Amino acid sequence: YAKYGLKPRVVGVFDSKGSAVDTSGLELEKLIEVKKKFGSVKNYAKTKNSMSGIDMIKNVDADVVIETTASNYKDAEPGMTHITTAMKRRMHVISVNKGPLALAFPSLMELATYNQVIFKFSGTVGGGTPILDYAKNSLRGERITSFSGILNGTTNYILTNMANGLSFDTALKDAKDKGYVEADESLDLDGLDAAAKLVILANWVMDMKVTMPDINCKGIRNVTTDDIKKAKKNNCAVKLIASCNKELIVEPKEVSVDDPLCVNGTLNAIAFTSEHSGTQTIIGKGAGGMETASSILRDLLDIRQEIAKI
């Protein structure tokens, strides 16, 4: 990223067991080695640091806070407190945690505006595939009238395997063995992950003021082999589709195999329909460590660019 004139100085990192802080800048290669060896960054310095995430945000000065804790769709914690505290301290925020946005997108945007900070979250939808940026920037000047897509790679992988002859239980086990399924499998199987991404898209792309309770959500637990066979006869495949066309819905639907949206495996795809440009489909990897890191770097560059304009 040096070619963009950006050399971030990381002054603090925390994980579930502790933290590492150095206001002059942490040595990132050493930090990674420590995490690999000990399972926590708290062993970075000779004196172990047990400072919590919220204490770090409150007491360590930084320009940007990057929030990467697990998504929680019950109360959005601890991510919600991390984000709001950072904003109140006039820190810009990058989040790949969907929970706070899914439950309180409108109020978080208002808080960012009030505190004159930049809030970026491109990694929450599509991982390394810039779905949010595409809709907001590449279709600038257009009015997007609706969109629909496959926003969860895990369920798409399971449904693809079912189309190849596996039972639901066998396909689920295979997905778990490959590490695709969330620790709380209901986030994938009941459509909650897709619903969270739908909320973020609806707010960001369509300027709707919605949260998770506004989504009519149905997962894939009740999809049977008969449903899969019936779809095949219709030259279709069953996919978990998140759609925004007046109503916000997540549900299994038959999609024609000739439709660009009908992707297989862990791929994500989304089709935006706009007033004058018709329908455009984006396909890409939905998640993964490197992909998520790529989205964070992209957001960091955007923040740098926006600050330079001020």
Locate the predicted segments by residue.
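N-terminal glycine-/serine-/threonine-rich beta1-alpha1-beta2 phosphate-ribose binding loop
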Residues: Y1-K88
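Rossmann-fold NAD(P)-binding glycine/threonine-rich loop
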Residues: A70-R89, V96-K136
